[in-house]
């Protein structure tokens, strides 16, 4: 039985070696998701617009929520919330689909020689496309209400990259576990819902009592959400020490997830 390398070098080499295949599969995934609908891929633009409008109405008008900055601006709360939600949605879309990544492509396991490790990258690429659209909607709304965004917005890719590494590590692990344990998909759905409310998306960290703030510090999404808001809305530079720690931690998770996937993939065909 073939042995699959689990080295850090192979994790990078596999992506580079299969980049054209990954790109083609991402395109197929994005277009296929909207195939048959009346307005097609335009839904990818309309969805974040509707989402931003709904959150603005519900939280700023119905609940009259404010972010704790002393400002009464309804659009400020909506844009701060939406910036955090953009980061969370990247995580939720990839991780939510990860347990079925192999199960949905059984033919790749049984009938052809296929680099299965790229399937989580396909989910990531499709999610990044939707994220890019959402950032565009956020940017348009910010420009209308607050003017030209700060140059710190250019640092957003540096904030997103460690989140991508973290998500990929989790996705590789879940893609493998989903083959052997079919209940993983159901469990992950619950975890994602819990994380949504346990992340500083709908409220600032300072809104929690001191004794509960520690819970958010153990949430791996908190640094990404907070730093994204800093560079997107608050016109601040991210804390370099926090960013470096996030990079290192995310790299460890990515390497462990990839190693687990490579070590367990030999049994996929037997289970499927």
Where are these regions (language model features)?
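Hydrophobic transmembrane alpha-helices and immediately adjacent juxtamembrane helices
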Residues: 1-272
């Amino acid at each position: 039985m073939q042995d699959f390398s689990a080295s850090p070098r192979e994790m990078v080499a596999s992506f580079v070696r299969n980049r054209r295949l990954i790109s083609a599969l991402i395109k197929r995934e994005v277009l296929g998701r909207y195939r048959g609908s009346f307005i097609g891929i335009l839904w990818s633009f309309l969805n974040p617009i509707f989402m931003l409008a709904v959150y603005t109405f519900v939280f700023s008008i119905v609940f009259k929520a404010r972010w704790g900055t002393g400002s009464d601006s309804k659009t400020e709360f909506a844009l701060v919330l939406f910036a955090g939600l953009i980061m969370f949605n990247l995580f939720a879309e990839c991780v939510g689909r990860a347990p079925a990544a192999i199960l949905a492509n059984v033919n790749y396991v049984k009938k052809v020689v296929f680099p299965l490790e790229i399937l989580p990258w396909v989910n990531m690429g499709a999610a990044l496309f939707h994220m890019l659209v959402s950032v565009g909607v956020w940017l348009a709304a910010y420009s209308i209400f607050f003017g030209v965004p700060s140059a710190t917005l250019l640092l957003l890719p540096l904030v997103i990259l460690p989140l991508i590494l973290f998500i990929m590590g989790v996705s590789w692990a879940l893609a493998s576990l989903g083959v052997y344990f079919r209940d993983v998909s159901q469990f992950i759905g619950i975890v994602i819902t819990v994380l949504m409310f346990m992340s500083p998306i709908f409220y600032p960290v300072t809104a929690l009592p001191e004794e509960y703030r520690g819970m958010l510090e153990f949430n791996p999404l908190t640094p990404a959400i907070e730093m994204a808001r800093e560079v997107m809305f608050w016109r601040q530079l991210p804390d370099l020490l926090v960013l470096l720690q996030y990079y290192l931690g995310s790299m460890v998770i990515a390497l462990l997830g990839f190693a687990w996937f490579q070590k367990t993939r030999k049994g996929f065909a037997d289970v499927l």
